[in-house]
């Protein structure tokens, strides 16, 4: 685990510059770029198929490897659409889960079976969430179970052209595109700007950009993030920040199994939390009793994404709740795209 974390940290630094490490990896990035271009062209030629479903599909993803705030963006979008009276569902591959079956993620679904991010999305929105190896299969299963669903939000999948999309939302942070190179020499999963693949619904006219950092560029909508009014215990009670100074007389220690743990630790400190120790874990890390034993005795603070896995071993742990607020102009633009996509398939019965 330590080697993996060290390697990830080294690559994250290398991806911000075209230095020695990035240049050494460039030949592999060139080969990867060729494969990406070939796959895209196969969809254009019809040799690989894109399939539609009878609902509007909004794909929310990122071209940057690592966390940029994609899942909080999904939650914000789903919550807004629900507030507008829309019937919304979510599909995902459920990265890191042990099962490959197509299934609905419910409140009692084990995180290991449904995936930590789908579990978090369902908990936050109560929307139907389906996971499968094929996003198209997940979307069909969702529509079969909930046939009145109007809009499907796809958690990740910008590069998965098998499911036709009506709208794309691409999420960035202050790193933007790093050194501008593709993996593994740079942080990009795909070329940017992304080439159009009209047959799959992927074109710049249907694309919205979100920046979760502090310095959005022109054309990007800003998302502001905070940790809310305090932390949550296993019963859902809020523990205000002011009470954490001497919480249970134990030292406060934070852990995070996310793409960029340092960002979470810094947000805790900005809320006045004095951390005696931090433990950075790989993204989607499967918690085990000995993982937490290394921190004891202490009061554990974890991310909302990790909470269910941590509470399985320590019911006293406290969880953060990430609050992300998108500017109103983003939702105005999203609504315009929805109206444009709405007419060919669904009757406009909401008056929007």
Kindly give the residue locations of the regions a language model identified:
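Residue-level signal for inorganic ion chemistry
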Residues: 31, 71, 121, 155, ...
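Phosphate/Mg2+-binding loops and adjacent switch elements
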Residues: 94-218
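C-terminal accessory "lid"/substrate-recognition subdomains
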Residues: 2-15, 177-299, 346-352
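A transmembrane-helix-recognition feature enriched in membrane-embedded lipid enzymes
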Residues: 2-56
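Short, flexible loop segments at boundaries between secondary-structure elements
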Residues: 281-286, 316-342
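Short secondary-structure boundary segments
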Residues: 92, 133, 303-305
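Short, high-confidence coil segments that cap the C-terminus of an alpha-helix
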Residues: 86, 146-150, 165, 249, ...
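Walker A (P-loop) phosphate-binding motif
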Residues: 40-107, 198-201, 344, 350
């Amino acid at each position: 685990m330590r080697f993996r974390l060290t390697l990830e940290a080294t690559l994250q630094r290398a991806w911000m510059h075209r230095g020695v490490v990035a240049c050494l990896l460039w030949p592999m990035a060139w080969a990867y770029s060729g494969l990406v271009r070939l796959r895209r062209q196969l969809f254009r030629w019809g040799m690989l198929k894109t399939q539609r479903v009878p609902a509007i599909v909004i794909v929310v993803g990122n071209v940057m490897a690592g966390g940029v705030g994609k899942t909080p963006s999904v939650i914000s979008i789903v919550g807004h659409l629900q507030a507008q009276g829309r019937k919304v569902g979510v599909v995902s591959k459920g990265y890191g889960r042990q099962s490959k079956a197509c299934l609905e993620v419910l409140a009692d679904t084990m995180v290991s079976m449904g995936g930590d991010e789908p579990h978090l999305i369902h908990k936050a929105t109560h929307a139907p969430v389906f996971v499968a190896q094929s996003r198209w299969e997940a979307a069909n299963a969702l529509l079969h179970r909930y046939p009145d669903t109007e809009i499907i939000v796809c958690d990740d999948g910008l590069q998965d052209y098998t499911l036709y999309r009506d709208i794309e939302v691409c999420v960035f942070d202050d790193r933007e595109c790093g050194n501008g190179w593709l993996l593994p020499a740079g942080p990009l999963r795909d070329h940017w700007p992304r080439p159009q693949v009209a047959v799959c619904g992927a074109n710049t006219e249907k694309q919205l950009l979100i920046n979760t950092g502090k310095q959005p560029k022109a054309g990007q909508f800003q998302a502001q993030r905070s940790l809310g009014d305090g932390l949550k215990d296993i019963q859902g009670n809020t523990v205000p920040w002011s009470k954490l100074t001497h919480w249970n007389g134990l030292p406060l220690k934070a852990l995070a199994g996310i793409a960029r743990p340092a960002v979470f630790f810094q947000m805790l400190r900005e809320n006045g939390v004095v951390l005696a120790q931090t433990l950075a874990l790989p993204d989607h890390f499967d918690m085990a009793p000995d993982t937490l034993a290394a921190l004891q005795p202490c009061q554990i603070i974890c991310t909302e994404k990790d909470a269910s896995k941590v509470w399985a071993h320590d019911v006293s742990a406290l969880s953060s709740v990430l609050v992300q607020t998108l500017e109103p102009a983003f939702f105005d633009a999203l609504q315009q795209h929805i109206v444009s996509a709405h007419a060919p398939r669904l009757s406009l019965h909401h008056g929007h």
